[in-house]
């Protein structure tokens, strides 16, 4: 499937022959550079252009220092002001369009921050946004999943600026052996369209889902939330994160930040253990890139077995205690 975007004629003085730089928008919390940015830089390297990182935040000097060490980065641009503290797109989007006047590519990780920001940037630039790419074929052509990952679309854009979100699980993390220069951007875009109210972060002793090397997830087959303690005991032995299918979340077994899938978190751990999960398309889209998939389900016809490297047809309430004891 090929989709060709034909941009409108614009009276821009941008000369693409001379300006072929990629701007990566950093994903961070004002203290640490998130690993998703490293995956995005790897995608930018496949485009093959000079790469710069933009950090918009408040008191984010440590983030800039982290970004400067990312291999392949020529420059880190820092916009440090209270109006960027919570990275509201109404403030950050005009900042990006100002900074990116000499850039041909604008990339961000397909996280909540990137998905919230890049559509607004694309609208301000009057170009199409390309979402969730998993492969770079050349500077104009990219591959992205469609139909919950059951098909891949090859998307070609002739827009003068490509605005792209990157599926981070499809690219490895860039190394941190660089020594880029750090520059300040003094642009301030205060706005009154939106106001930050509050945020509540989930705290857990376990690894964060998108960064975990081992994940054990439960589905509707767990029957109720109390039975997730069986997963917790195994997770404690493995040092694993705990996930869930949408069915388990919708049933109220666990909070929605456990959800793995197309409408949840996209993960690609070294080991993914699916327990009592039938394997709906939406769930498979979120975990099928895992290096090793183990499925435990009493229904031998469950779709999850079609993607599993190892499958066990058994009663999870018998298997999990035995597994926990064996570990």
Question: Where do the model's predicted regions map?
Answer:
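N-terminal glycine-rich FAD/FM-binding segment characteristic of electron-transfer flavoproteins
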Residues: 3-327
